[in-house]
Design a protein with these regions (language model features):
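Polar/charged low-complexity regulatory segments
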Residues: 1-170
Length: 171
C-alpha cells in the first residue's frame, strides 16, 4: 500500500472514531504525515541557519528574513516558515506528545501552532479566497486535530517508537 494512502486511511478512521467531520483537515493531516516521513521536511534549511530544529530556530529564521540589512532579506519567507511552525508543532504534539512534554512546553507548542496557522490563514485568505487549505480550522481546532494524530498513532501505529515511520521521523 502506498504510504500516502496508509496515512489517509489511518487519519480518516481516527476522525470517524472521534466524530471529527472535516475532510479537508483529514486530507491535510495525511499529507503532513507523508511529508514528514522525510527528516529534511521535519527540519528544513533556514535562510540563516543550516537546519531549523526548534520552534525558536524557526522564529529566529523569520527575524533574519525580515532584516533589511541582511543578505537573507526575504519577508515573503515568513509565510513558509509560519506554515512549517504550524505543521511541526501539530506533528510533534500529535505524534510525539511525550517527547514534547519532556523537552518543551506543550502549551507553548499549542500556542505557537495556533498562531502560525492563523497567520497563514489570513495571508492565504487575502490571496486565494475560499479555495485555501483549512489553515483557519487547523488553528481553531488545533488541540482536537493533534489529539486525532495521537489517537491514530496509538491505534494505527501500535508498535510505538519501533514502527518504521516513527523511526524515520526522528533520524
Amino acid at each position: 500500500m502506498e504510504l500516502r494512502n496508509f496515512f489517509e486511511r489511518a487519519i480518516r478512521a481516527s476522525f470517524r472514531d472521534l466524530a471529527l467531520q472535516d475532510e479537508p483537515a483529514a486530507t491535510y493531516l495525511a499529507d503532513l504525515l507523508t511529508r514528514f516521513v522525510r527528516t529534511e521536511n521535519v527540519y528544513p534549511r533556514g535562510v540563516a541557519l543550516p537546519r531549523l530544529e526548534t520552534v525558536v530556530d524557526m522564529l529566529l529564521d523569520i527575524q533574519a528574513a525580515w532584516r533589511e540589512d541582511s543578505p537573507y532579506f526575504r519577508p515573503e519567507h515568513e509565510v513558509t516558515v509560519r506554515r512549517h511552525i504550524g505543521d511541526y508543532t501539530m506533528f510533534m504534539i500529535g505524534v510525539f506528545r511525550e517527547r514534547v512534554e519532556r523537552m518543551a512546553s506543550t502549551g507553548y507548542y499549542i500556542s505557537q501552532g495556533k498562531h502560525a496557522y492563523r497567520f497563514v490563514s489570513e495571508h492565504v485568505r487575502v490571496g486565494a479566497g475560499a479555495a485555501a487549505p483549512p489553515y483557519r480550522r487547523l488553528a481553531e481546532r488545533f488541540e482536537s486535530y493533534a489529539g486525532a494524530l495521537d489517537y491514530a498513532r496509538r491505534v494505527h501505529f501500535p508498535e510505538g517508537p519501533c514502527h518504521p515511520f516513527l523511526r524515520l521521523a526522528l533520524e
